[in-house]
Amino acid sequence: MKNRSVVFCGLLLSFYLPARTQPTTASPNPEVILLGTAHDLHFKTENHYSLADLRTEVESLHPDLICGEITPEAYQGPMEGYFPPEAAYLAEVAPTLHARFAATDWRITHAWQSRAEVMQPKEIKDKLETLTEETAKQMQSQTEPTLFDYLHTKGVAIADYQFEQVIGENTVSDIAMGGWHERNRRIVENCLDAAAGAGRIVIVYGASHIPQLQRQLAARGITAQIASRRFVPGGMGGVPPSVIARWQRNLDNLKRILDGSLTVSRDSLDKVKDSHRVQDLESALKTYSGGAEKK
């Protein structure tokens, strides 16, 4: 197994090195703010970090460009629902915030990630499992006013420790986590590629991305700020009817992918099967369908 891991890492490096070309630079140098989301936890009232709160936070930052957690190839297509519901929400409301939205995520293949999960050293798996359990306990017992406060302080430190100290870069475990370092490198490149004319960029991704995105931006000479809370929790609020329609379309597409009536690549099918996005979208619709904003 050790020899296989060495060979695997060698293949990994041979794949990555051509991709790690001269870092992308934005001109003029934009101001970049990193804002963490909580995925399905936005739909739980006790977290005091709803999509309405997220919108207020983004609006208060006055972005020219919002970089969101959808790959360019999935954006507005059959696979958009595979990505976090809040990303489609932000894409839909961005024009009302006088901002552009750019789909900037990047993903490795499901087969490659699955193979790495099998090959991942047991001691690393055990450390990650323990860390996940400890983090869950901290989140449940945290005394911060909102989940936002925890995610942007203690949560950042935990994520940085997990991905830099426990997992590391260019390791089997790194690939088992979706090629985490390369993924965040590509996210930054995609954001900067979309940054023409943007004075202020807000990168809105799952909060665990924050420390690695900050590192990747620093490697390009950009000092990114971590967002501080600018909203007062206002309850679950509502979402525009266009968001409900978009979520419903995305949910229908995922269900059609799963039942075979919508043909996609084997990789896309495997990703949908191995995700909980159907449940996430159902939760989003259940939470917000009755409280949609009026146009």
PLM regions and their residue ranges:
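Bacterial N-terminal signal peptides
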Residues: 7-15
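Compositional signal for N-terminal targeting/processing segments
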Residues: 18-295
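Bacterial N-terminal signal peptides that target proteins for export
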Residues: 1-7
